[in-house]
Protein backbone atom coordinates (compact mmCIF):
# COMPACT_ATOMS: atom_id res chain seq x y z
CA UNK A 1 0.00 0.00 0.00
CA UNK A 2 1.14 3.46 -0.84
CA UNK A 3 0.49 6.44 1.43
CA UNK A 4 -1.64 9.06 -0.32
CA UNK A 5 -2.65 11.77 2.17
CA UNK A 6 -3.58 12.74 5.71
CA UNK A 7 -7.29 13.45 5.84
CA UNK A 8 -7.51 14.48 9.51
CA UNK A 9 -4.75 15.21 12.00
CA UNK A 10 -5.02 15.17 15.80
CA UNK A 11 -6.50 18.69 16.05
CA UNK A 12 -9.00 18.06 13.25
CA UNK A 13 -10.15 14.83 14.91
CA UNK A 14 -10.68 16.67 18.20
CA UNK A 15 -12.71 19.40 16.47
CA UNK A 16 -14.72 16.80 14.58
CA UNK A 17 -15.57 14.79 17.70
CA UNK A 18 -16.51 18.01 19.52
CA UNK A 19 -18.96 18.85 16.73
CA UNK A 20 -20.42 15.33 16.79
CA UNK A 21 -20.89 15.56 20.58
CA UNK A 22 -22.78 18.85 20.18
CA UNK A 23 -24.92 17.38 17.38
CA UNK A 24 -25.83 14.38 19.56
CA UNK A 25 -26.92 16.69 22.39
CA UNK A 26 -28.95 18.88 20.02
CA UNK A 27 -30.66 16.07 18.10
CA UNK A 28 -31.62 14.22 21.29
CA UNK A 29 -32.64 17.40 23.15
CA UNK A 30 -30.20 16.58 25.93
CA UNK A 31 -28.56 13.35 27.00
CA UNK A 32 -31.26 11.51 28.94
CA UNK A 33 -31.26 7.73 28.23
CA UNK A 34 -28.38 8.03 25.75
CA UNK A 35 -25.95 5.11 25.52
CA UNK A 36 -22.90 5.26 23.26
CA UNK A 37 -21.90 1.84 21.92
CA UNK A 38 -18.49 1.73 20.28
CA UNK A 39 -18.07 -0.89 17.57
CA UNK A 40 -14.84 -2.77 18.27
CA UNK A 41 -12.08 -1.87 17.69
CA UNK A 42 -11.56 1.82 17.02
CA UNK A 43 -15.18 2.78 17.58
CA UNK A 44 -14.75 2.14 21.31
CA UNK A 45 -12.13 4.84 22.04
CA UNK A 46 -14.01 7.22 19.74
CA UNK A 47 -17.22 6.56 21.73
CA UNK A 48 -15.35 7.18 25.01
CA UNK A 49 -14.02 10.49 23.71
CA UNK A 50 -17.48 11.63 22.58
CA UNK A 51 -18.89 10.63 25.99
CA UNK A 52 -16.18 12.64 27.76
CA UNK A 53 -16.99 15.69 25.62
CA UNK A 54 -20.73 15.35 26.31
CA UNK A 55 -19.98 15.08 30.03
CA UNK A 56 -17.83 18.20 29.79
CA UNK A 57 -20.62 20.15 28.03
CA UNK A 58 -23.65 18.84 29.96
CA UNK A 59 -22.13 17.87 33.32
CA UNK A 60 -23.85 14.47 32.98
CA UNK A 61 -22.10 11.12 32.66
CA UNK A 62 -23.12 9.20 29.53
CA UNK A 63 -23.07 5.41 29.58
CA UNK A 64 -20.55 3.86 27.18
CA UNK A 65 -20.38 0.24 26.08
CA UNK A 66 -19.03 -1.77 23.20
CA UNK A 67 -20.17 -4.27 20.63
CA UNK A 68 -17.73 -6.75 19.12
CA UNK A 69 -18.35 -7.50 15.47
CA UNK A 70 -15.77 -9.99 14.23
CA UNK A 71 -15.02 -9.64 10.56
CA UNK A 72 -13.81 -12.34 8.24
CA UNK A 73 -11.13 -10.75 6.12
CA UNK A 74 -9.31 -11.83 3.01
CA UNK A 75 -6.59 -9.40 4.05
CA UNK A 76 -6.41 -6.32 6.24
CA UNK A 77 -8.06 -4.08 3.67
CA UNK A 78 -11.17 -6.00 2.69
CA UNK A 79 -14.09 -7.16 4.74
CA UNK A 80 -15.68 -10.41 3.65
CA UNK A 81 -19.37 -10.80 2.93
CA UNK A 82 -20.72 -11.07 6.48
CA UNK A 83 -19.52 -9.50 9.73
CA UNK A 84 -20.06 -11.93 12.60
CA UNK A 85 -21.37 -11.03 16.04
CA UNK A 86 -19.41 -12.20 19.05
CA UNK A 87 -22.35 -13.54 21.10
CA UNK A 88 -21.07 -12.09 24.40
CA UNK A 89 -20.14 -8.81 22.80
CA UNK A 90 -22.84 -6.47 24.08
CA UNK A 91 -21.98 -5.35 27.58
CA UNK A 92 -24.84 -2.95 28.34
CA UNK A 93 -28.63 -2.86 28.87
CA UNK A 94 -30.26 -1.39 25.76
CA UNK A 95 -33.95 -1.56 26.72
CA UNK A 96 -35.72 1.80 26.20
CA UNK A 97 -32.39 3.59 25.58
CA UNK A 98 -31.32 5.86 22.76
CA UNK A 99 -28.46 3.80 21.38
CA UNK A 100 -25.79 5.61 19.41
CA UNK A 101 -23.51 3.19 17.59
CA UNK A 102 -20.06 4.70 17.08
CA UNK A 103 -17.62 3.49 14.43
CA UNK A 104 -14.50 4.84 12.79
CA UNK A 105 -15.43 4.37 9.11
CA UNK A 106 -18.74 3.76 7.35
CA UNK A 107 -18.13 1.91 4.10
CA UNK A 108 -20.49 -0.83 2.85
CA UNK A 109 -22.82 -0.65 5.84
CA UNK A 110 -22.46 -4.34 6.72
CA UNK A 111 -20.71 -3.74 10.06
CA UNK A 112 -23.33 -1.16 11.08
CA UNK A 113 -26.10 -3.60 10.16
CA UNK A 114 -24.50 -6.39 12.20
CA UNK A 115 -24.14 -4.01 15.16
CA UNK A 116 -27.81 -3.01 14.89
CA UNK A 117 -28.79 -6.68 14.87
CA UNK A 118 -26.68 -7.23 18.00
CA UNK A 119 -28.44 -4.38 19.79
CA UNK A 120 -31.92 -5.57 18.81
CA UNK A 121 -31.06 -9.13 19.82
CA UNK A 122 -30.27 -7.90 23.36
CA UNK A 123 -33.39 -5.81 23.89
CA UNK A 124 -35.63 -3.18 22.42
CA UNK A 125 -34.05 0.26 22.41
CA UNK A 126 -36.05 3.45 22.01
CA UNK A 127 -34.04 4.10 18.84
CA UNK A 128 -30.68 3.39 17.23
CA UNK A 129 -28.50 6.12 15.74
CA UNK A 130 -25.13 5.90 14.02
CA UNK A 131 -22.10 8.17 14.45
CA UNK A 132 -18.97 7.75 12.32
CA UNK A 133 -15.72 9.65 12.08
CA UNK A 134 -15.47 9.06 8.30
CA UNK A 135 -18.13 8.15 5.72
CA UNK A 136 -16.36 7.00 2.57
CA UNK A 137 -19.40 6.00 0.52
CA UNK A 138 -19.77 2.75 -1.47
CA UNK A 139 -22.81 1.58 0.49
CA UNK A 140 -24.15 -1.89 -0.24
CA UNK A 141 -27.07 -1.50 2.18
CA UNK A 142 -29.53 1.37 2.74
CA UNK A 143 -27.71 2.66 5.83
CA UNK A 144 -26.71 6.23 6.55
CA UNK A 145 -25.04 7.80 9.56
CA UNK A 146 -26.89 10.32 11.71
CA UNK A 147 -23.61 11.99 12.68
CA UNK A 148 -20.69 12.18 10.25
CA UNK A 149 -17.31 13.65 11.03
CA UNK A 150 -16.15 13.87 7.43
CA UNK A 151 -17.62 12.67 4.14
CA UNK A 152 -14.82 11.43 1.91
CA UNK A 153 -15.72 10.07 -1.52
CA UNK A 154 -13.10 7.41 -2.21
CA UNK A 155 -12.35 4.92 -4.91
CA UNK A 156 -12.51 1.23 -4.10
CA UNK A 157 -8.75 1.19 -4.67
CA UNK A 158 -8.26 3.43 -1.65
CA UNK A 159 -8.07 2.45 2.01
CA UNK A 160 -9.13 4.84 4.78
CA UNK A 161 -7.07 4.16 7.91
CA UNK A 162 -8.25 5.66 11.20
CA UNK A 163 -5.61 5.73 13.90
CA UNK A 164 -6.43 6.49 17.54
CA UNK A 165 -3.81 7.07 20.22
CA UNK A 166 -5.35 4.49 22.55
CA UNK A 167 -4.51 1.75 20.02
CA UNK A 168 -2.09 3.21 17.47
CA UNK A 169 -0.18 5.78 19.59
CA UNK A 170 -1.29 8.61 17.28
CA UNK A 171 -4.49 10.29 16.14
CA UNK A 172 -4.86 10.56 12.37
CA UNK A 173 -7.01 9.58 9.43
CA UNK A 174 -4.90 8.59 6.44
CA UNK A 175 -5.70 7.49 2.92
CA UNK A 176 -3.66 4.80 1.20
CA UNK A 177 -3.74 3.50 -2.36
CA UNK A 178 -4.03 -0.31 -2.61
Swiss-Prot record:
The record's top EC class is transferase
Pfam families attached to this UniProt entry: Pribosyltran (PF00156)
Q: What SUPFAM superfamilies would the database entry show? A: PRTase-like
- GO terms, molecular function: RNA binding; uracil phosphoribosyltransferase activity
What are the protein's UniProt keywords? Glycosyltransferase, RNA-binding, Transcription, Transcription regulation, Transcription termination, Transferase
Q: Tell me, what is an example of a GO biological process annotation in this record?
A: DNA-templated transcription termination
Q: Please indicate if the UniProt record lists Transcription regulation as a keyword.
A: yes
Q: Which reaction does it catalyse?
A: UMP + diphosphate = 5-phospho-alpha-D-ribose 1-diphosphate + uracil
Q: Which domain of life is it from?
A: Bacteria
Q: What is this protein called?
A: Bifunctional protein PyrR
Tell me which species this is from.
Clostridium novyi (strain NT)
- Its gene name is pyrR
